[in-house]
From Swiss-Prot:
Keyword Transmembrane helix: yes
UniProt name for this protein: Pecanex-like protein 4
Family, per entry: Belongs to the pecanex family.
Superkingdom: Eukaryota
Matching Pfam families: Pecanex_C (PF05041)
Keywords: Glycoprotein, Membrane, Transmembrane, Transmembrane helix
Organism: Homo sapiens
Residues linked to a glycan: 1120, 1147
Cellular component annotations (GO), alphabetically ordered: membrane
Length: 1172
């Protein structure tokens, strides 16, 4: 990668310079890129200043004492409401009057770039350009009303006398009045005239026109605080807040332009998550619907607890609902309902009831403990001697033990020091299991302590608190509702918070504000917020330092401006630190602009970073099937690893990266609760691009240093500490390993190719015999033929030959076939299967269809005598309608189909279908090729059949079938015709190019080609035999020659049972992977290196390496990606921000984003993992 790849290409730079001023001003377009009449700019200025004009009228009347403040607000609001309706109806009139096609009202770059032809100041095209209008009539009315309210309340908010009362400064009042009205005009223009494209874009499409509401929403928030201050007296805090917000009000345009303030939809979801997690003790949820439902239920629980009069009742209510809301109730209900319908009896249903019984017992014990401790224990102020202090000491010990047991499970302790207890040099599953046994036992102990011991210990601590003894207040209800919920929802964090609160209380004086003014519930709430923000701050700081340092230390990342940016970051480091702190307080991503060390505060958004539900979209391709097979097994193994603590502390928003060969799995935790965790797994594309390969190579290096090296020192350091990826553990998963071998020395060997032809006939015989013996209805008729005294007559299959081809058919067939066999295509990696004349001869399939040949004598068909009264001698006449015209002197070479009779009454059980017994080759050619038929192999295969239940009769019957000459002749005819179709006219050894083509389903032209392709089932069997033979040739070259027929059958049975041999592009290839065939094989050709390759997939238990990613690095890069693509429209595939970065894993992070911004090839729906 060149370090000076442009951040934005010339076109996008020009586009950005036109769009950004429009965003700053709220919608006016003063930089168009083409010449426009002056009235275009004048009209926009008038529309922009219109709210200020009406607000100025009201303000002037108020200052002159003519109107009171609320009448002033009403007057300005009414005038603006009338103006808004006029503006909107003018837009509607222009649309109806215009004869041009109305443009689509979406974010369309091309539409923004179109040049408009303006005819007059008030022309339809001018009005449509200035006022695009609304998509929905409801929004036309609603937005107009909001515009009137915003103008009226804004006038009231910015009255000079009011501002002077707040600050007592005339100069400050003038500045706030001027810039405040600029802010108000920007918001009004965006709402009612033309909506600007916001830098804070959450949704890819604004379907319901929510974006215009963004700026007025913040206007209303600021005004609401001022109104509260007006009507609520004696609240100094509210007055200070109002003063601060009046100052911030003038900076709103800059916050809107920088994208710091979220749009309404993102703000709502973010606010619900924050309140649910820190105010109500819950967790962020896997879907927006679950978030809404859980938020309502949790808020209802907190409110209901306030109205319970009994203190014991309050404690029991909080304990019970805290436990129940921390469970995955929806999944449990769905599972029980599904099993009651689909699995009425089975171990899985019993397991679900055991699970429910376990939860009921835990709930009963928790309620019993809470009530007993609350009722009987003494409630004195906490001290070192009372019972709550004793429980606090126990919690400290428990926290230390759990931390040690968790860190032992990972390869690195706190991500820095090598864990001496973790297995070293783990490369195979067997070695891993041998060395991991002790750690798994420790993991079980940890899980018991975390799931059973810790919650009850914390419930004891909370139940003994004196705050619950007296009359409960709002703060007590909120704090303890959260505390009793956190005990179950996030046990490890709750334990840490409880220990901190207990420790601070024990070591500090009782007279300080912390102990005197706050109850235990509020202390826990504040400690929880501080804990979360401190972890975020450390992660953000580490991310910022990594971006800053690598921009200089990594040569491929160093640009001409890097030195300047580094110096500026050092000089303004306090300001950069303020940005990081502000981003941490808002819990919003730290946005590195273009992933350079230029940091901005991204707008707050949900923890998932994307508006849609996880797993709804993915860029599906041929490689997706590997993830479909792997994810269920990976999920099962993750359950054990998460329960043991191998992946560290499980928090919503955590990201993990799994690696195996060329596969990369991106794992994100969506939701956590008591004994469950919800995750999303994404599969990234296999290594193709150079950027992807470079970062994947660095991931391999990080994992190799962690898992595949012997360390001499006991506690060595993590050499890749600055990387966003920290190795955690390895997971044994049953999946496909991908091996690619060079076959050039085998497939082009003359001796191997010579043996190939003979082996092909044997494999054809075996496959056809196996197919016929296992056809539906064959085994059911085994006993029906034993009582028959006479062998059945075998009528020739008449009227099954293809009708004469038209010249167009012949030309089409020849051109397609010879194009496939041209020299340009012999090196294709996977020749495509040509479905030749599949629908060409549909007429022949119609019952009773006879084609009349001009000049011929019409013969009577056997099928015409439906009554069955056919003279016996007529049955022996072969009707050969449909054959090409030939010379009379050469008619002895034409095929003749006599009526035949099996010598064995059981032969029809392995007889070929009637349509396969038709002839298409001259008799002389068939006799010539019949000498190649291996009769001894044919008889051996028949004797090996297992189609009889009576073993004493089986050998005799199979011997009779093997000696049936008529049956053998049928097999000779069909096998040799297939053989002739696969190899063409030449009887020489095939070339490697020929092998590759036929393997791909492209057969050479021959007189038998049509005959074979018209029988799709037989065609597939012949192709299958050819592929089996190729695999047999490779195995013989690798493992040695085959000694006897039994060993050959062993090979073929293994292919049939354990292998799929075909093309990667086949649908059956994907089906075989999903069915978990043990092995898959495909033949290919590398045209760059000129070698033949074999690809073998082997299903086996192998180790997947898993590491934890810095969550703030992921969120920051995703925030930049969203800004670049949705606002700057920087979709250049070679842009700087998508290039490989070995420490930030920038390219992989972009891939893992939700489509359409990212492009994972697989994305699972939320997967619920049970942690017990």
């Amino acid at each position: 990668m060149s370090p000076d790849v442009p951040l934005l290409n010339d076109y996008k730079q020009d586009f950005f310079l036109k769009r950004f001023p429009q965003t700053v001003l709220g919608g006016p377009r003063f930089k168009l890129g083409y010449c426009a009449p002056p009235y275009i700019y004048v009209n926009q200025i008038i529309l922009f200043l219109m709210p200020w004009v009406w607000g100025g009228v009201g303000t002037l009347l108020y200052q002159l004492g003519i109107l009171k403040d609320y009448y002033t607000a009403a007057l300005s609001g009414g005038l603006m409401l009338f103006t808004a309706f006029v503006i909107q109806f003018t837009s509607l009139y222009a649309k109806n009057k215009s004869t041009t096609v109305e443009r689509i009202l979406t974010t369309d770059i091309l539409a923004e770039e179109d040049e408009h032809e303006f005819t007059s100041c008030t022309g339809a095209e001018t009005v449509k350009f200035l006022i695009p209008g609304k998509k929905y009539v409801a929004n036309t009315v609603f937005h107009s009303i909001l515009a009137g309210l915003a103008c009226g309340l804004g006038t009231w908010y910015l009255l000079p006398n009011r501002i002077t009362l707040l600050y007592g400064s005339t100069g400050g009042t003038a500045l706030l009045f001027f810039f405040g009205w600029m802010t108000l005009c920007i918001a009004e223009y965006s709402l009612i005239v033309n909506t600007a494209t916001e830098t804070a874009t959450f949704q890819t499409q604004d379907t319901y026109e929510i974006i215009p509401l963004m700026r007025p929403l913040y206007i209303f928030f600021f005004v609401s605080v001022d109104l509260a201050h007006r009507f609520v007296v004696n609240m100094p805090a509210l007055e200070h807040m109002n003063q601060i917000l009046h100052i911030l009000f003038v900076f709103l345009p800059f916050l809107w332009a920088l994208g710091t303030l979220p749009p309404p939809d993102a703000l709502l979801l973010w606010a619900m998550e924050q309140v649910l997690e820190f105010g109500l003790g819950g967790s962020s949820m896997s879907t927006h619907l679950r978030l809404l439902v859980m938020f309502i239920m949790s808020a209802g629980t907190a409110i209901a607890s306030y109205f319970i009069p009994s203190t014991v009742g309050v404690v029991l209510f909080m304990t019970g609902f805290g436990f129940l809301l921390s469970l995955n109730l929806s999944d449990m209900g769905h599972k029980i309902g599904t099993k009651s319908k689909d699995l009425p009896s089975g171990p899985e249903k019993h397991f679900s009831w055991k699970e429910c019984l376990f939860y009921i017992i835990i709930l009963v014990l928790a309620l019993l403990e809470t009530s007993l401790l609350h009722h009987f224990a003494g409630f004195s102020q906490i001290s070192k001697s009372n019972s709550q202090a004793i429980v606090g000491y126990g919690l400290m010990i428990l926290l230390i033990i759990l931390w040690i047991l968790r860190e032992i499970q990972s390869v690195y302790i706190i991500g820095i020091f090598r864990n001496p207890f973790y297995p070293k040099d783990v490369q195979t599953v067997t070695v891993f299991f041998e060395k991991q046994t002790r750690l798994m036992k420790i993991g079980i102990v940890r899980r018991i302590l975390l799931t059973l011991v810790s919650p009850f210990a914390m419930i004891a601590f909370l139940s003994l608190d004196s705050s619950l003894q007296g009359l409960h207040s709002v703060s007590v209800c909120i704090g303890f509702t959260r505390a009793f919920r956190m005990v179950w929802q996030n046990t490890e964090n709750a334990l840490l918070e409880t220990v901190i609160v207990s420790t601070v209380h024990l070591i500090s004086s009782t007279d300080i504000w912390w102990n005197r003014s706050l109850d235990t519930g509020l202390r826990l709430l504040l400690v929880g917020i501080i804990r979360d923000r401190l972890i975020q701050f450390i992660s953000k700081l580490q991310f910022a330092v990594t971006v800053l340092l690598t921009s200089w230390t990594e040569k491929k990342q160093r640009r001409k401006t890097t030195a300047t940016l580094c110096i500026l970051n050092i000089v303004f480091s306090p300001f950069v630190l303020v940005i990081i702190v502000f981003s941490t307080l808002l819990s919003s991503p730290l946005l590195p602009l273009f992933t350079l060390p230029v940091f901005l505060v991204g707008f707050p958004r949900p923890i998932q970073s994307w508006p849609g539900a996880a797993g709804t979209t993915a860029c599906v391709c041929a490689d997706t099937v590997y993830y479909y097979q792997m994810v269920p097994r990976l999920t099962a193994v993750l359950q054990t690893a998460m329960a043991a603590g191998s992946l560290g502390l499980l928090l919503p928003g955590s990201h993990y990266l799994g690696r195996f060969q060329d596969r990369l799995m991106w794992i994100m935790i969506l939701e956590c609760g008591y004994t469950y965790c919800s995750i999303n797994i994404k599969g990234l594309e296999l290594q193709e691009t150079s950027c992807h390969t470079a970062e994947a190579r660095r991931v391999d290096e990080v994992f190799e240093d962690a898992f595949e090296q012997e360390y001499t020192r006991v506690c060595s350091l993590n050499e890749h500490f600055g990387n966003v990826l920290t190795p955690c553990t390895v997971l044994p998963v049953k999946l496909y390993s991908d091996a690619r071998n060079v076959l050039s020395g085998i497939i082009d060997s003359h001796e191997n190719l010579k043996e190939f032809k003979g082996d092909l006939i044997k494999v054809l015989v075996w496959i056809l015999v196996q197919y016929c013996s296992k056809r539906p209805g064959m085994k059911e008729n085994v006993h029906n033929t034993e009582n028959k005294g006479k062998a059945p007559l075998m009528l020739p299959a008449l009227n099954t030959l293809p009708p004469p081809k038209s010249p167009e058919d012949i030309d089409s067939l020849n051109s397609e076939t010879f194009n496939d066999w041209s020299d340009d295509n012999i090196f294709d990696d996977e020749p495509t299967i040509k479905k030749v004349i599949e629908e060409k001869h549909q007429l022949k399939d119609l019952p009773g269809t006879n084609l009349f040949i001009p000049g011929s004598v019409e013969s009577q068909r056997v099928g015409d005598h439906s009554t069955g009264t056919v003279p016996e001698n007529d049955l022996y006449k072969a009707v050969l309608l449909g054959y090409p015209a030939v010379d009379k002197g050469k008619q002895e070479d034409m095929p003749y189909i006599p009526l035949m009779e099996f010598s064995c009454s059981h032969s029809h059980l392995v007889c070929l279908p009637a349509e396969w017994r038709t002839s298409c080759m001259p008799s002389s050619k068939m006799k010539e090729m019949s000498s190649l038929f291996p009769e001894d192999w044919y008889q051996f295969v028949l004797r090996q059949l297992e189609c009889y239940h009576s073993e004493e009769k089986a050998s005799n019957v199979l011997e009779e079938i093997a000696k049936d000459k008529v049956l053998k002749d049928f097999y000779v005819h069909t096998v040799m015709t297939c053989y002739f179709s696969l190899f063409g006219i030449d009887n020489m050894a095939p070339s490697p190019g020929h092998i590759l083509r036929v393997y791909g389903g492209v057969l050479p032209w021959s007189v038998a080609l049509d005959w074979l392709t018209e029988k799709p089932e037989l065609f597939q069997l012949a192709l299958k035999a050819f592929r089996y033979t190729l695999k047999l040739m490779i195995d013989k070259a690798s493992l040695g020659p085959i000694e006897d027929f039994r060993e050959l059958i062993k090979y073929l049975e293994e292919y049939e049972r354990d292998w799929y041999i075909g093309l990667v592009s086949d649908e059956k290839w994907k089906e075989a992977i999903l069915q978990e065939k043990p092995y898959l094989f495909s033949l290919g050709y590398d045209s760059n290196m000129g070698i033949y390759t074999g690809r073998v997939l082997s299903l086996q238990e192998l180790l997947i390496q898993v590491g934890k990613l810095n969550p703030e690095a992921v969120r920051g890069q995703w925030a930049n990606l969203s800004w670049e693509l949705l606002y700057a429209t920087n979709d250049d595939e070679e842009r700087y921000s998508i290039q490989a970065h070995p420490l930030l894993l920038r390219n992989l992070t972009v891939q893992a984003a939700e489509p359409p911004l990212g492009y994972p090839i697989y994305s699972s729906k939320p997967l619920h993992i049970h942690l017990y």
